[in-house]
A protein has these predicted regions:
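Transmembrane beta-barrel domains of Gram-negative outer membranes and organellar outer membranes
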Residues: 20-135
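Residues on the lipid-exposed face of transmembrane beta-strands in outer-membrane beta-barrel proteins
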Residues: 51-53, 64, 96-102, 125-129, ...
Length: 240
Protein backbone atom coordinates (compact mmCIF):
# COMPACT_ATOMS: atom_id res chain seq x y z
CA UNK A 1 0.00 0.00 0.00
CA UNK A 2 2.86 2.41 0.79
CA UNK A 3 4.29 1.88 -2.68
CA UNK A 4 0.92 2.62 -4.27
CA UNK A 5 0.56 5.86 -2.30
CA UNK A 6 4.11 6.83 -3.31
CA UNK A 7 3.25 6.34 -6.99
CA UNK A 8 0.20 8.60 -6.66
CA UNK A 9 2.26 11.30 -4.93
CA UNK A 10 4.98 11.15 -7.59
CA UNK A 11 2.45 11.38 -10.40
CA UNK A 12 0.75 14.40 -8.87
CA UNK A 13 4.09 16.04 -8.11
CA UNK A 14 5.16 15.60 -11.75
CA UNK A 15 1.99 17.39 -12.77
CA UNK A 16 2.57 20.32 -10.44
CA UNK A 17 6.05 20.87 -11.90
CA UNK A 18 4.62 20.83 -15.43
CA UNK A 19 1.71 23.17 -14.77
CA UNK A 20 1.21 26.06 -17.22
CA UNK A 21 -1.62 28.50 -17.86
CA UNK A 22 -3.52 28.26 -21.13
CA UNK A 23 -3.99 31.65 -22.81
CA UNK A 24 -3.65 33.20 -26.26
CA UNK A 25 -0.42 35.21 -26.09
CA UNK A 26 0.08 35.98 -29.80
CA UNK A 27 -1.76 35.80 -33.11
CA UNK A 28 -2.88 32.35 -34.30
CA UNK A 29 -4.67 31.40 -37.52
CA UNK A 30 -7.97 29.59 -37.94
CA UNK A 31 -6.09 26.43 -38.95
CA UNK A 32 -3.91 26.78 -35.84
CA UNK A 33 -7.01 27.01 -33.68
CA UNK A 34 -8.43 23.85 -35.27
CA UNK A 35 -5.24 21.91 -34.59
CA UNK A 36 -5.06 23.25 -31.04
CA UNK A 37 -8.68 22.22 -30.47
CA UNK A 38 -7.97 18.65 -31.61
CA UNK A 39 -4.95 18.20 -29.34
CA UNK A 40 -6.03 20.17 -26.27
CA UNK A 41 -9.57 18.83 -26.52
CA UNK A 42 -8.24 15.26 -26.62
CA UNK A 43 -6.56 15.89 -23.26
CA UNK A 44 -9.90 17.03 -21.83
CA UNK A 45 -11.94 14.02 -22.98
CA UNK A 46 -13.53 12.00 -20.16
CA UNK A 47 -11.85 8.68 -20.98
CA UNK A 48 -13.41 5.52 -19.43
CA UNK A 49 -10.53 4.23 -17.26
CA UNK A 50 -12.73 1.21 -16.41
CA UNK A 51 -13.86 -2.11 -17.94
CA UNK A 52 -17.25 -2.73 -19.55
CA UNK A 53 -18.71 -4.72 -16.65
CA UNK A 54 -21.29 -2.90 -14.46
CA UNK A 55 -20.64 -2.07 -10.81
CA UNK A 56 -23.98 -3.44 -9.65
CA UNK A 57 -26.66 -1.69 -7.65
CA UNK A 58 -24.52 -1.44 -4.48
CA UNK A 59 -21.23 -0.74 -6.24
CA UNK A 60 -18.96 2.30 -5.84
CA UNK A 61 -15.67 3.17 -7.52
CA UNK A 62 -13.60 6.06 -6.09
CA UNK A 63 -10.20 6.71 -7.60
CA UNK A 64 -7.37 9.08 -8.43
CA UNK A 65 -6.27 9.11 -12.06
CA UNK A 66 -3.48 10.62 -14.09
CA UNK A 67 -4.10 10.96 -17.83
CA UNK A 68 -1.19 12.16 -19.99
CA UNK A 69 -1.75 13.30 -23.57
CA UNK A 70 1.04 13.83 -26.10
CA UNK A 71 0.96 17.13 -28.00
CA UNK A 72 2.89 18.66 -30.92
CA UNK A 73 4.87 21.06 -28.74
CA UNK A 74 7.10 22.01 -31.69
CA UNK A 75 4.17 23.66 -33.48
CA UNK A 76 4.13 27.47 -33.32
CA UNK A 77 0.51 27.60 -32.21
CA UNK A 78 1.34 25.79 -28.96
CA UNK A 79 3.99 28.39 -28.15
CA UNK A 80 1.27 31.03 -28.55
CA UNK A 81 -1.21 29.16 -26.35
CA UNK A 82 0.73 28.89 -23.06
CA UNK A 83 1.62 31.76 -20.78
CA UNK A 84 5.41 31.42 -20.99
CA UNK A 85 5.65 30.40 -24.66
CA UNK A 86 7.43 27.16 -23.77
CA UNK A 87 4.99 24.21 -23.90
CA UNK A 88 5.83 20.74 -22.67
CA UNK A 89 5.49 17.74 -24.96
CA UNK A 90 2.49 16.44 -23.01
CA UNK A 91 -0.50 17.59 -20.98
CA UNK A 92 -0.97 15.87 -17.59
CA UNK A 93 -4.49 15.82 -16.19
CA UNK A 94 -4.91 14.47 -12.62
CA UNK A 95 -8.54 13.54 -11.98
CA UNK A 96 -10.77 12.59 -9.09
CA UNK A 97 -13.20 10.04 -10.54
CA UNK A 98 -16.27 8.66 -8.77
CA UNK A 99 -18.68 6.04 -10.17
CA UNK A 100 -21.90 4.57 -8.74
CA UNK A 101 -23.81 1.49 -9.82
CA UNK A 102 -27.57 1.75 -10.37
CA UNK A 103 -30.30 -0.78 -11.20
CA UNK A 104 -30.70 -2.22 -14.69
CA UNK A 105 -26.93 -2.48 -15.38
CA UNK A 106 -26.48 1.29 -15.39
CA UNK A 107 -23.46 3.11 -13.93
CA UNK A 108 -23.13 6.87 -13.57
CA UNK A 109 -20.03 8.86 -12.73
CA UNK A 110 -18.34 12.22 -12.46
CA UNK A 111 -14.81 13.56 -12.53
CA UNK A 112 -13.24 16.82 -11.42
CA UNK A 113 -9.90 18.48 -12.08
CA UNK A 114 -8.49 21.62 -10.47
CA UNK A 115 -4.86 22.00 -11.52
CA UNK A 116 -2.84 23.92 -8.90
CA UNK A 117 -0.87 26.92 -10.19
CA UNK A 118 -2.78 26.95 -13.48
CA UNK A 119 -6.03 28.41 -14.75
CA UNK A 120 -7.29 24.97 -15.83
CA UNK A 121 -10.33 23.44 -14.19
CA UNK A 122 -12.37 20.63 -15.68
CA UNK A 123 -15.45 18.62 -14.79
CA UNK A 124 -17.22 15.75 -16.50
CA UNK A 125 -20.23 13.44 -16.31
CA UNK A 126 -20.74 9.91 -17.63
CA UNK A 127 -23.39 7.21 -17.96
CA UNK A 128 -22.75 3.59 -18.94
CA UNK A 129 -25.19 0.81 -19.80
CA UNK A 130 -24.05 -2.82 -19.82
CA UNK A 131 -25.78 -4.66 -22.66
CA UNK A 132 -24.08 -7.84 -21.40
CA UNK A 133 -23.07 -8.10 -17.74
CA UNK A 134 -20.39 -10.69 -18.40
CA UNK A 135 -19.86 -13.99 -16.61
CA UNK A 136 -17.21 -16.64 -15.99
CA UNK A 137 -17.37 -17.60 -19.66
CA UNK A 138 -18.80 -14.60 -21.52
CA UNK A 139 -17.45 -11.05 -21.87
CA UNK A 140 -19.17 -7.87 -20.75
CA UNK A 141 -20.34 -5.39 -23.38
CA UNK A 142 -21.39 -1.82 -22.67
CA UNK A 143 -22.07 1.55 -24.24
CA UNK A 144 -21.02 4.77 -22.51
CA UNK A 145 -21.70 8.46 -23.05
CA UNK A 146 -19.64 11.24 -21.46
CA UNK A 147 -19.36 15.02 -21.37
CA UNK A 148 -16.60 17.32 -20.10
CA UNK A 149 -16.34 21.09 -19.74
CA UNK A 150 -13.28 23.34 -19.37
CA UNK A 151 -13.49 26.16 -16.85
CA UNK A 152 -11.12 28.82 -15.54
CA UNK A 153 -9.53 29.75 -18.89
CA UNK A 154 -10.62 33.23 -19.99
CA UNK A 155 -9.38 33.12 -23.59
CA UNK A 156 -11.06 29.90 -24.77
CA UNK A 157 -14.13 27.76 -24.14
CA UNK A 158 -13.93 24.00 -24.71
CA UNK A 159 -16.37 21.17 -24.14
CA UNK A 160 -16.26 17.56 -25.29
CA UNK A 161 -18.68 14.70 -25.86
CA UNK A 162 -17.89 11.05 -26.50
CA UNK A 163 -19.75 7.82 -27.16
CA UNK A 164 -17.88 4.60 -26.36
CA UNK A 165 -18.41 0.91 -26.98
CA UNK A 166 -16.49 -1.24 -24.48
CA UNK A 167 -15.86 -4.96 -24.12
CA UNK A 168 -14.07 -6.69 -21.23
CA UNK A 169 -13.45 -10.14 -19.74
CA UNK A 170 -12.19 -10.89 -16.25
CA UNK A 171 -9.54 -13.54 -15.53
CA UNK A 172 -8.80 -14.01 -11.83
CA UNK A 173 -7.35 -10.66 -10.65
CA UNK A 174 -7.09 -9.21 -14.17
CA UNK A 175 -9.71 -7.64 -16.40
CA UNK A 176 -8.45 -6.62 -19.86
CA UNK A 177 -10.73 -4.41 -21.92
CA UNK A 178 -10.87 -2.61 -25.24
CA UNK A 179 -13.12 -0.14 -26.96
CA UNK A 180 -13.78 2.42 -29.66
CA UNK A 181 -14.96 6.00 -29.23
CA UNK A 182 -16.71 8.62 -31.32
CA UNK A 183 -15.69 12.05 -30.04
CA UNK A 184 -16.73 15.65 -30.60
CA UNK A 185 -14.76 18.66 -29.38
CA UNK A 186 -16.22 22.17 -29.46
CA UNK A 187 -14.10 25.30 -28.94
CA UNK A 188 -14.46 29.07 -29.18
CA UNK A 189 -12.15 31.98 -28.32
CA UNK A 190 -12.66 35.16 -26.29
CA UNK A 191 -9.30 36.86 -26.90
CA UNK A 192 -8.71 40.49 -27.90
CA UNK A 193 -5.73 39.35 -30.00
CA UNK A 194 -7.67 37.32 -32.58
CA UNK A 195 -11.10 36.94 -34.14
CA UNK A 196 -11.66 33.29 -35.02
CA UNK A 197 -14.66 31.17 -35.92
CA UNK A 198 -15.90 28.56 -33.47
CA UNK A 199 -14.52 25.07 -34.06
CA UNK A 200 -16.27 21.69 -33.83
CA UNK A 201 -14.10 18.64 -34.48
CA UNK A 202 -15.38 15.06 -34.72
CA UNK A 203 -12.97 12.15 -34.41
CA UNK A 204 -12.48 8.51 -33.49
CA UNK A 205 -10.32 6.84 -30.85
CA UNK A 206 -9.37 3.27 -30.06
CA UNK A 207 -8.50 2.24 -26.53
CA UNK A 208 -7.20 -0.72 -24.56
CA UNK A 209 -6.76 -1.17 -20.84
CA UNK A 210 -6.10 -3.58 -18.00
CA UNK A 211 -7.62 -3.52 -14.53
CA UNK A 212 -5.72 -5.31 -11.76
CA UNK A 213 -7.14 -6.09 -8.32
CA UNK A 214 -4.24 -7.29 -6.12
CA UNK A 215 -6.29 -7.05 -2.92
CA UNK A 216 -10.00 -6.90 -2.07
CA UNK A 217 -11.45 -3.46 -2.89
CA UNK A 218 -8.18 -2.10 -4.33
CA UNK A 219 -7.93 -1.55 -8.10
CA UNK A 220 -5.08 -0.44 -10.33
CA UNK A 221 -5.94 0.40 -13.92
CA UNK A 222 -3.81 1.25 -16.94
CA UNK A 223 -5.23 2.52 -20.23
CA UNK A 224 -3.88 3.73 -23.57
CA UNK A 225 -5.83 5.30 -26.40
CA UNK A 226 -5.03 6.67 -29.82
CA UNK A 227 -6.82 9.14 -32.07
CA UNK A 228 -5.55 12.62 -32.89
CA UNK A 229 -3.01 12.04 -30.11
CA UNK A 230 -1.61 9.26 -27.95
CA UNK A 231 -2.97 9.16 -24.43
CA UNK A 232 -1.83 7.17 -21.38
CA UNK A 233 -3.77 6.75 -18.15
CA UNK A 234 -3.13 5.30 -14.70
CA UNK A 235 -5.83 4.84 -12.07
CA UNK A 236 -5.53 3.81 -8.43
CA UNK A 237 -8.63 3.53 -6.30
CA UNK A 238 -11.17 1.50 -4.39
CA UNK A 239 -14.09 -0.44 -5.83
CA UNK A 240 -16.70 -1.86 -3.48
Amino acid sequence: MKKIIAIVVLLLAAHFVSAKDIEITDVITQDDFKEFTKEFGSALLFSPMAPAEPLGITGFDVSLEMVITDISDDKVFWKNMVDDGDPYSFIPVPRLHVQKGLPFNIDVGAMYVAMPDTNIKLWGLEAKYAILEGSMVTPALSVRASYSKLQGVDDINVDTQSLDVLVSKGFLMFTPYAGASLTKINASENSALVTLDDVSETGYRGLAGLQFSPFPLLIINGEISYGETMQYGLKIGFRF
